Amino acid sequence: MPEEEFEWNESKLNALSEILTQWAPHDELKLENVILEAKMAWIHESTDAVALEKEFEKLLNTSFDPLMDYEEHQRVKNGVCSPAKSTKLDWITKWANIAEKLSISHINCSKAPHKTINFQRLQILPNMTSILAIAHTEADNVILIYGHTKEGIDFQTVLRHSYSNIPDGSLQTIHFLTKNLLDLYSQLFSRKITAEFKTRHFRCLPSFWLQYDVLAPIFEQFRAPRAPRIPLDEATSNWANRKWENYQYLTYLNDITGRVRGEVHNHPIFPWVCDFSEENGGFRQLNRTKYRLCKGDDQLREMYSREPSHHVPELLSDIGYMVYRARVEPKDNLCRHVRRKWVPEEYPSTMSRMYQWTPDECIPEFYDDPSIFNSCHPDMADLRFPEFVSSPQEFIEWHRKMLEHEEVSMNLHRWIDLVFGFNLAIDNSKNALNLHLCFVEKNRRGLRTTGMVQLFNRPHPIRMPLNYDPKLDNYHLKMESFGFGMTSEHRKEPEVEPDEDSHYQIYQKIKKVRRLRHNTYFSSMVSAMEVMAQIVLAPHLAGRFDDPDHIRRCIQLYSYRIPANYRRLFDFLFNTEQDFPDCDEFSFFVSVRLNIPTKILNFSEEFGKCVSLHILRKLDVIPPFSKRSQLIILKEVESLKKSIRLCDHMEQCVVAAFQQLLEDEEACIQSVHRLMPVITRSLSQSALEDLINPMIELIQCETSVKLLDRRFLMHVSICYGTHTFLDLFLPPIVEACASMNCDRSVVAKESIMWLAKRYGPVICAKFISSNVLRIMASCYEAFEMVGLEQQPKAVFNVVLQGDETCSRIESLLSEIVLTYSVTFITVQFLPFCVDLIEQFHKRSSVQLEPGLVSVFRIVELSIRSMSDHQLMNYLEEFIIQKVIYRVLTILLDASFQFSSMRVRIIIICKVCQLLHSITQKIGTENTRIYANQPFKLMFSTFSEIYETDEELRINLRKRPSENTLFEVPLWMVEDVVDKFAKEWGVPFLSSFCDDPAFLIPFVSNSSSSSSPPASIAHSPPSAFTAYSLGGMSSGNRLFSLSASSPVNSVNSLGGLSFCDSGSLSAVWCARVSAAVCGVDNYRFDHLSLCNYTGHQEKIRKLAAISNENSFVSASSDKTVKLWSIKPELDEIGCQWTYQKHTRPVHDITILADNSIASTDGVLHVWDPFRTTLLAQMEWDSKEGSGGNIMRVENVDRHILSAICSLHSTVKLFDSRVGGWTCELKVSPGPGLTRAITVRDKGNKMAVALSNGTLAILDARNGKINALAQTNSTHTVSVNWLSDTRLLVCDADECGIFLETNPRAHIVRKLQDPVSAACLTDNSLVTLQNGTILRVYRNSGELQIETKIRPDELPGTPTAVLPLPLNCSYLIGSSHGAIRLMC
C-alpha cells in the first residue's frame, strides 16, 4: 500500500500489534510505508520500585478528591504517618490507566496468543509530545510509539544559547514561554496529572513552542543512575586545589556547556598545549586562542572592522573537526564538510603539520584515543606522530602528560577565561581580541543550538602551586577574592516558635493539612515556577539546570536582572509557607501576577491551534494530499494568518512556522498564496529577510507553477521592494523560462513579459532582457537531439531538444523588441553575442559551448525583427564578421578544444543553418557582396582537407603536422555543397572557391537535375535588376547597399533613427542605450522624456513607488495626485487625485505596502489603489494644544515619524495599529521641531529644532545619543548622507555637511541655500539658488552642476526626485508643472 493511503485507525493498530511481537529495540519500526519512532523500557530487579510508584502517582493522581476520608484528615492533623503502601507494582494496569487518561491507544501482547487492544482516537495537546500507542510484548516491558520524528530541540540547549535565542532578555519571548508553561499546566491539571517539571523533559520547536514529554520522568527510572553533577564552584575548587586533573576539569566544563562527542558543530574543545617540536618543551601561549596565534592580531582587527564586527568565527569548525578525524571518518563525511573532491594528499600527515595548519583548538581524542591515528582509507596514510614516541598509545600517554604539565597547569586558567570565562563577555572580549561571531551575528535564521557558552563572569582562579606552603595564606586570600572559597557555611535564621495557643499556630496547622493533602499539586506549581526562573536567568545559570538550590541562589545574586513582576512571583520559591494559589487557579494567578499582555495571551492561544494542526499532519496519521489533509492545511494556514495579525513582537514564532510550511511540499503553494498579503502588511523587514532564501528555493522548484503567476509576483515585489526583487527573485523566474516543464516555462514567460511592461524599458534592458539572454544557453546544456539517434547525420536537419524551449524565450525577446524598440537588438542582443564569442575565443570551456548555439538563435531573431535598412547596416561588419565568421574560425581550428567531436559537429551544423537563413533573407546578390567571407572560409577549409583524384574520388589530403584545421566529416561537406549548389547553382557557388574544380565531385550527380529557379539564380549579375534580390520567395525583399554605403558603428547609442519598430521615442531609446552601455548615471543631458500636467500651484514634494513606474506629487493646491510613467506617451494626465485635504499639503511619503501618508497639518494615510482612507490623525498634545503636522518620515516598513510646528517632540504612527504609538522627547531645552530624517530603520533619527539644535536619537527607545548646535534656525530639511554625516538645509543660510562623530562639526558649506534635496542609495540631488541642479556623491563630491532653463520647465524648480533605476529625474515647479528629465 502506498504511503499516500496510510491513515491511523484501528486496523493499523492491529497491524502494529503483529509487528511489535517481532520487533527489536535497535530495528526500524515500519508500519506499511511509514516509519514510526519507538522506545522500549524493561522493569527489572534493580529498578527503584518506590521511585517508580511515585512517578505513576503523579500521572494517576487521586489526591484532588473533595471526599477525602475523615481518618486521613485526623492522621495528617495529629502527625501520624499513613500506613505503608504495598511496593508491588501492577505494571500493565497502570500503563493502561495512563493510556486511558491521555487518550492513547493501548496494546497488550504479554499474554500471547491473547491480545488486548484498546484503540483511542488521537487527541493532540499542543504542549505535549504526541504518542500514538503504548504497547507491551512482555509482562515486564513497555514500548512507546511516536509518529513523525521529533522536530524539537532540547530546551536546555536553547537556554544555554539564550544570548541569541532570547536576545537582550526579550520580555515578550519570556512571557510567551511562560504562557506555554501555564497552558501545559492547565492541560495536565484538567486530566488530574501533577507533573514535576524539569527543563530536560521539554523540547522546543523551531517556532519557539514548548512541548513536554509527560512520560519522560518514568523512563528516567529505567536508566542507570547517573552520578549527580557537582556545582561549578565546587568543581573549580577541586581543580584549583589539585584534587582534579586538568583533563577531568576540562571534560567537566565541556559537559556543562552541552558539548557532546560526535556532534560536528558542538564537539568538546581542548587546548593545544605544545607544538610537537620537542619532547619536553614547545609550549604554546595559553593567553591567546589558537585562532589568534594562527591569524595574527592585525587580521583580527581587520575582521573587527567589517560587519558583523568580530574577531573569532568559531573555536572548532566543522572543517577542523573533520580534518582531525580524517583517518576514522567515512569518506562521504569528509567530502561533505572539507572538500567535495577527494584528495587525501591535502590532509595534514603529521601532528606537527596539523598544529601549524589549523586555526582551531584541539579535540579530546588526541588525549585519550590512539585509534584516531590509524587510517581506514586505503589511499590515506596513517597520521604520523613525533619521532620521540614510537606508537599511538605512547603518544597519547605523552600528550596527556603534557596536558598535566606544571607549565600548562599554571596558565590553563587564562585559556579557560577565553573559552568558557569572562573574556567571552562583549566588553572584555574586545580588549582580548576574542569577540566571537555567535554573540554579534544578527538576523540568524532559526534557533541557535551551537556556539560559545559563558560559565564565569569573573577571572578564573589560578591553580594551587605545586610547591604550595600552607603557612603562606596568600593563595587562600586570592581564592576568596575570586569567590571560590574552600568552605562554605550557610547561616540558618533562628526559627521563631509561635505561641501554643495563638491563632497563627492554628492557621499553620490548617495550611499544613491542606498542603500535605495536595502535596503533588504544590510540588508541580513550585517546579513550574523554577522552570520560569530558569528561562529568565538562563544566561546566569552556567549550565546547571534543574538544580533548585542553584536556581534560588541565582535569583538572589541576579535579582537586578529579573523583571519586577517575575521577581515578586519568585518570592514564593523562598517562602513556601506563604499562601499559594489553589491548584485550579494557578495559571490565572500567575498570568495576572506577571501582567502578561493580552496580545501575547491571544497570540499564544491562536498560535497553539496552528501548532496542533501542524503536529497532526506531521504524525503520519492522515494520508497526505487527501481531502482531509487539505482541509487541515487550510485551517492551519488560517490560524497562522490570525497569529501573524496578532504577532506584534513575536515574529520569530510566525516566521519559523511559515518556513515550515514553505518546506512542506503539500502545503507550500497554498501557504504562500494565502499568507503573502498579510505577511507584507505585518512583518518587519528583518523578518521578511529571513524568508528570502526559502521563498527563492520554492520558486526554483519545478512543480511551483502557481508561484510564477503575476499576482504572487506583485505581492513579492511590493513586500521586498524593487531592488531586492530584481536582484534576488527575478533570476530564478527567468531561469524558469528555460524549464523543460512546458506549463512552467509558458507561465514564466508571460510573467516576465508582464514585468517588462510594468517596469519600463530602462529597467527591462538593465535587469530583464539581459538575464533572458544569458538563460538561453541553458536550453542546450545536454546537446541532446530529438529522437533516438544522437549522432547528427544531416547538416540542415539537426534538431535539438532545447529548440522548443528556446523558441519560447525567443518569442519573449521578440515581444520585448516589438513593445519597445529595435534598440534592444542593436545595443544589447548583438553585442551580447559578440561578447560571448570573444569569451570563448579567449578561453574555450564546456560551460560556454551551449552559449554558441544560443548566439545563433539570438542572431536569427534579430534578423527577423530588424527592418531592411537596419539589417543591412549591421550585416557585414557585425553579424557576418564578428559573429558567423568568428565562430567558424573557432570551429574549423582544431586547436580550440571542445568537450567532444559530436558537440563541435552540432555547432557547425547550427552555424550553417544560420548562414542559410541569412542568405534566404538577403538574397544571392547581397550574399555575394556582404556575406562572402564565411563561404570562402568554409570552402577553402574543405579544399585543404579533401582532394579529388582523376576518377573524381574524394580522398583526405595529406597535410603538414603544423596544420591545425579540424577534419570536417565528408558527409557534412557534401550536405553543405549540395544545399547551396541546388539553390544558387555551381557557377555562383564556385565564386567562393579558390579551386572551383574541387566542387565537381560533389555536384556531378545533382547538376544534371538542376531546377529552373536555380538556373535563374545563377544568371549573370548583369541580368539582375539593380538592387533587386531576385526571385526569392522567402524572407523580406531587401535593398542591396553599395560597398561605399555608411554602416553605423555598433558603439553608437542604439541608433536613434532606428526606432520605427517600437513605441519608444528617440529620447527613450537613448536612455535605454545609455543604461545598457553602462554610461555613468551621474549625467544630466537636459532631455525631456515626459510632461505631467494637472496641478495648479506649487509642487511641494514628490515621492515614487519603489518600482519607479508610478509616483505621487503634493501641491499647494490642496491635492495629492497619482501618476504613471508611460514611455510611449509624451504628455500624461494623473491617474487619480486625493482631494480630502483642506489646506496646502506640506509633506508626503510612501509606506512599504504602497499606502501613502500625506499631511496638510493633519496626517492622512490612504491607499491609492483602493482609493480608501485608512487613517486620519491630528496632533493631540498632553498639554491640550494641538498644532500642524509639518513633516512625515518613514522609520521602517510600518512606522512613520511626524513632527509638529508647535512642539518639540516626535510622534510615531504604526500603520498596523492605525494610530499613534508613542511620543519621543527630542531635547531637554526649548525649541520647536522643524525637520526630521531617519536612517537604519530607526536606529538613527536626526531632528532639527528652531533654536539651532540638532538632536540625534534612537527611535526604537527614544534615547538621545547626541545634541549638536548649528546656526540653522529655519531648517527646511535634514538628510543622512552616511552613518555619521548629515546635510542640513536652511531657508536663509547655505547648506552644510555636518559630521557627527566623534563630535559634531561642519565639514563643508555648499555654495547656495538648498531649496529641495533628495537622497538615493549613492547620491544626493539638490536644488540650489532657485534653478541650479547639483548632484553629489555620498562622500560629498560634486558630480553634476547644471541650470534648469525656463524653456525646459515653466516656473522655478521647487521639488526634485531622482529615479536611479531609470537613470532620470522628476522635477516639479512653482507653476505646478512636473517634468521627467534625463
Swiss-Prot record:
<keyword id="KW-0853">WD repeat</keyword>
<dbReference type="InterPro" id="IPR015943">
    <property type="entry name" value="WD40/YVTN_repeat-like_dom_sf"/>
</dbReference>
<dbReference type="GO" id="GO:0031902">
    <property type="term" value="C:late endosome membrane"/>
</dbReference>
<keyword id="KW-0963">Cytoplasm</keyword>
<dbReference type="GO" id="GO:0016197">
    <property type="term" value="P:endosomal transport"/>
</dbReference>
<feature type="repeat" description="WD 2">
    <location>
        <begin position="1140"/>
        <end position="1176"/>
    </location>
</feature>
<dbReference type="Pfam" id="PF02138">
    <property type="entry name" value="Beach"/>
</dbReference>
<dbReference type="GO" id="GO:0031906">
    <property type="term" value="C:late endosome lumen"/>
</dbReference>
<dbReference type="InterPro" id="IPR036322">
    <property type="entry name" value="WD40_repeat_dom_sf"/>
</dbReference>
<dbReference type="GO" id="GO:0031901">
    <property type="term" value="C:early endosome membrane"/>
</dbReference>
<keyword id="KW-0677">Repeat</keyword>
<dbReference type="GO" id="GO:0005770">
    <property type="term" value="C:late endosome"/>
</dbReference>
<dbReference type="GO" id="GO:0045022">
    <property type="term" value="P:early endosome to late endosome transport"/>
</dbReference>
<dbReference type="GO" id="GO:0010008">
    <property type="term" value="C:endosome membrane"/>
</dbReference>
<dbReference type="GO" id="GO:0031905">
    <property type="term" value="C:early endosome lumen"/>
</dbReference>
<feature type="repeat" description="WD 1">
    <location>
        <begin position="1094"/>
        <end position="1133"/>
    </location>
</feature>
<comment type="subunit">
    <text>Interacts with sorf-1; the interaction is direct. Interacts with bec-1.</text>
</comment>
<dbReference type="GO" id="GO:0048284">
    <property type="term" value="P:organelle fusion"/>
</dbReference>
<dbReference type="GO" id="GO:0141039">
    <property type="term" value="F:phosphatidylinositol 3-kinase inhibitor activity"/>
</dbReference>
<comment type="function">
    <text>Together with sorf-1 negatively regulates the levels of phosphatidylinositol 3-phosphate (PtdIns3P) to enable the conversion of early endosomes to late endosomes. Binds to sorf-1 and the sorf-1-sorf-2 complex likely acts through bec-1, a non-catalytic subunit of phosphatidylinositol 3-kinase (PI3K), to suppress PI3K activity, thereby negatively regulating endosomal PtdIns3P levels.</text>
</comment>
<dbReference type="InterPro" id="IPR001680">
    <property type="entry name" value="WD40_rpt"/>
</dbReference>
<keyword id="KW-0967">Endosome</keyword>
<dbReference type="Pfam" id="PF00400">
    <property type="entry name" value="WD40"/>
</dbReference>
<dbReference type="GO" id="GO:0005829">
    <property type="term" value="C:cytosol"/>
</dbReference>
<feature type="domain" description="BEACH">
    <location>
        <begin position="229"/>
        <end position="463"/>
    </location>
</feature>
<comment type="similarity">
    <text>Belongs to the WD repeat WDR81 family.</text>
</comment>
<protein>
    <recommendedName>
        <fullName>Suppressor of organelle fusion 2</fullName>
    </recommendedName>
</protein>
<dbReference type="GO" id="GO:2000643">
    <property type="term" value="P:positive regulation of early endosome to late endosome transport"/>
</dbReference>
<dbReference type="InterPro" id="IPR036372">
    <property type="entry name" value="BEACH_dom_sf"/>
</dbReference>
<dbReference type="InterPro" id="IPR000409">
    <property type="entry name" value="BEACH_dom"/>
</dbReference>
<dbReference type="GO" id="GO:0005769">
    <property type="term" value="C:early endosome"/>
</dbReference>
